[in-house]
Amino acid sequence: MHRRSSKSYSSRNSKTPERSKIPDCVIASNKSAEYNYFLDKTFEAGLVLLGSEVKSVRQQKISLSEAYIYEDNSEIWLANLYIPEHKTGGWTNHNPRRLRKLLLHKYQIARLRKDLLIPGITLVPIKFYFRNGRAKLLISLARGKKLIDKREVIKEREATLEANRALKHRLRRPRAQRNTQRSVTPRSTRENKNVQRNKARSARCNVRHEN
């Protein structure tokens, strides 16, 4: 009977390496999301993209600023995401702002539909990235901020900026003082030595004249 080699047996039983959950490359992010909304639960969704769209996205030509998400007939759709036409697409090029379907599990869609029934809750796109060579979109359940909340965010940003400036000023100040001390101390010591030498010379000259 033919015996199985140890190599083939070990290769079959060897575990396949797990795919990393860290994004390979972040292509675009919605910077205004944290300013305009209170973000809650996040979900990772896949996208149905065309070949010309993937080429444009690889060149980081994408804008999430005007994109929004809605649910229709138990499906999640991404609208107004801007992906420009690719220069080599030709007649097969895509519509830059076409509707794009998001790929989620059934239990995730059911959970999102339940949460979207709450008044004031919406879905917001956060980040567009590639993971293991596949396009992914990070979406979040969010609640809109009022004008007072936005003013508080601006105040917090200004406070953090002022604190960072104060820290930088404190860190730079000791270095400047050290440099001035290093530059001043050698000159003062040289001047003292020169004064002492001049006094010694004048004393010697006086002694000679007296003799």
Curated annotation (Swiss-Prot):
It is found in: Cytoplasm. Residues 177-187 have a biased composition (Polar residues). Keywords: Cytoplasm, RNA-binding. Gene3D superfamilies: 2.40.280.10. SUPFAM superfamilies: Small protein B (SmpB). One of its GO terms (cellular component) is cytosol. The keyword Nucleus does not apply. It comes from the Bacteria. One of its GO terms (molecular function) is RNA binding. Residues 1-20, 170-211 are annotated as: Disordered. The keyword Disulfide bond does not apply. GO terms for biological process: trans-translation. It holds the Pfam family SmpB. Belongs to the SmpB family. NCBIfam families: PRK05422.1, smpB. Required for rescue of stalled ribosomes mediated by trans-translation. Binds to transfer-messenger RNA (tmRNA), required for stable association of tmRNA with ribosomes. tmRNA and SmpB together mimic tRNA shape, replacing the anticodon stem-loop with SmpB. tmRNA is encoded by the ssrA gene; the 2 termini fold to resemble tRNA(Ala) and it encodes a 'tag peptide', a short internal open reading frame. During trans-translation Ala-aminoacylated tmRNA acts like a tRNA, entering the A-site of stalled ribosomes, displacing the stalled mRNA. This is SsrA-binding protein. It comes from Tropheryma whipplei (strain TW08/27) (Whipple's bacillus).
